[in-house]
């Protein structure tokens, strides 16, 4: 069966064409059924392809005269969407010339372009940015939203949970992902009205969906591996994500400094090197690269701007997996299963929840 192409914004990211093309070539070795649409400066892409014969015959170049800069405002980037590599990659998905787009460019611009060009799925009010985070368990943690929406009501959080669960079923091979809401405590009385209303709604909907809703979790428990999907608003999620990244860098720097402090420490490093290399691999963001904009009529994946070729390859591999497993159609099916209106309502945070409506009907 012919699989849709993956459009790669070859000009995005800190390292530009060389790393993006090399990353696509590495991913091609793992997913050799996929072909690529490389979008950007044609001459520079052709030059980069000379070192990757496995990709040359499996890709087409779409010349784009402009790029989106890292500090460009989304409104400005939108006006140039028809001529930039990022905008043209997303529009290729819109036109059906590619099944998904991958970019390491400006996150705000990518979000704005993707939302405008692809629109949200029926039953989804806002797309969410989701990523895989390392844990002590067997699987990575799916966490969303990580910055696309700074404020969310209960309705948004429930929609995020449904999308995150669909994502976790694919990337971690789970039948019924364990879903929790990020909160300042695990007690049912803790948190905002939006969080408590979302919890009530998810309890009511869990039976109709292949997920297990486990209530609330706290930020210090995200890495334990006892939950598969954590849902939050983009403001809290972005802070939690960057705190985890900062903690990982702190541990790595502390180990490096400790092992170089004396001759005995250096000898200790040599003895413990296998363990420290394993730790380094586990904490390396390149091994968990590829944040997905969930809730759109198409797949858009954001690679870290400073990702290595291996990191880009992992982002492309995530994209390929989501295309193979029909993520968008799975989310649509889950939304249809519960009914769009069932998750477009919420209690105190804006409307009546399914459970609240039932109580009122009973009282009447």
Curated annotation (Swiss-Prot):
Renumbered residue ranges of the record's region Disordered: 343-364
Keywords (A to Z) from UniProt: Cytoplasm, Lipid biosynthesis, Lipid metabolism, Phospholipid biosynthesis, Phospholipid metabolism, Transferase
Main localization of the protein described in the UniProt heading: cytoplasm
Reactions that this protein is recorded to catalyse: a fatty acyl-[ACP] + phosphate = an acyl phosphate + holo-[ACP]
GO cellular component, one term: cytoplasm
GO terms (BP aspect): fatty acid biosynthetic process; phospholipid biosynthetic process
Enzyme class, UniProt record, top EC level: transferase
EC number(s) stated in the UniProt entry for this protein: 2.3.1.274
Pfam families: FA_synthesis
InterPro entries: FA_synthesis (IPR003664), Phospholipid_synth_PlsX-like (IPR012281)
The protein's annotated pathway: Lipid metabolism; phospholipid metabolism
Record's subcellular location: Cytoplasm
Listed GO MF terms: phosphate:acyl-[acyl carrier protein] acyltransferase activity
Self-association and partners: Homodimer. Probably interacts with PlsY.
Record's function text: Catalyzes the reversible formation of acyl-phosphate (acyl-PO(4)) from acyl-[acyl-carrier-protein] (acyl-ACP). This enzyme utilizes acyl-ACP as fatty acyl donor, but not acyl-CoA.
Similarity comment: family membership: Belongs to the PlsX family.
Matches recorded under NCBIfam families: plsX
Listed name of the protein: Phosphate acyltransferase
Annotated source species: Novosphingobium aromaticivorans (strain ATCC 700278 / DSM 12444 / CCUG 56034 / CIP 105152 / NBRC 16084 / F199)
């Amino acid at each position: 069966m012919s699989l849709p192409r993956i459009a790669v914004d070859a000009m995005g990211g800190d390292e530009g064409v060389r790393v993006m093309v090399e990353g696509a070539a590495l991913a091609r070795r793992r997913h050799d059924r996929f072909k690529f649409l490389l979008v950007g400066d044609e001459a520079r892409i052709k030059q980069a392809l000379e070192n990757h014969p496995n990709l040359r015959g499996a890709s087409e170049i779409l010349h784009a005269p402009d790029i989106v800069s890292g500090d460009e405002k989304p409104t400005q980037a939108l006006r140039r969407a028809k001529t930039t590599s990022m905008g043209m990659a997303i529009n290729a998905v819109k036109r059906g010339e590619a099944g998904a787009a991958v970019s390491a460019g400006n996150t705000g611009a990518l979000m704005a372009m993707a939302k405008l060009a692809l629109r949200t799925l029926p039953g989804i009010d806002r797309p969410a940015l989701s990523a895989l985070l390392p844990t002590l368990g067997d699987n990575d943690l799916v966490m969303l939203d990580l910055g696309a929406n700074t404020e969310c009501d209960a309705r948004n959080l429930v929609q995020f949970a449904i999308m995150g669960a669909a994502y976790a079923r694919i990337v971690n091979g789970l039948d019924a992902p364990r879903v929790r809401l990020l909160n300042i405590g695990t007690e049912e009385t803790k948190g905002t009205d939006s969080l408590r209303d979302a919890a009530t709604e998810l309890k009511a909907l869990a039976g109709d969906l292949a997920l297990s809703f486990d209530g609330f979790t706290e930020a210090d428990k995200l890495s334990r591996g006892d939950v598969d999907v954590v849902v939050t608003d983009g403001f809290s999620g972005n802070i939690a994500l960057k705190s985890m990244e900062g903690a990982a860098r702190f541990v790595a720097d502390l180990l490096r400094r400790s092992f170089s402090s004396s001759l005995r420490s250096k000898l200790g490093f040599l003895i413990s090197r296998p363990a420290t290399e394993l730790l380094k691999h586990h904490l390396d963001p390149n091994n968990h690269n590829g944040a997905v904009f969930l809730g759109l009529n198409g797949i858009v994946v954001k690679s870290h701007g400073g990702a290595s070729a291996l990191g880009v390859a992992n982002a492309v591999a995530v994209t390929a997996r989501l295309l193979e497993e029909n993520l968008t159609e799975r989310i649509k099916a889950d939304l249809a299963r519960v009914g769009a209106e069932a998750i477009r309502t919420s209690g105190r945070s804006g409307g009546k929840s399914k459970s609240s409506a039932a109580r009122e009907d009973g009282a009447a």
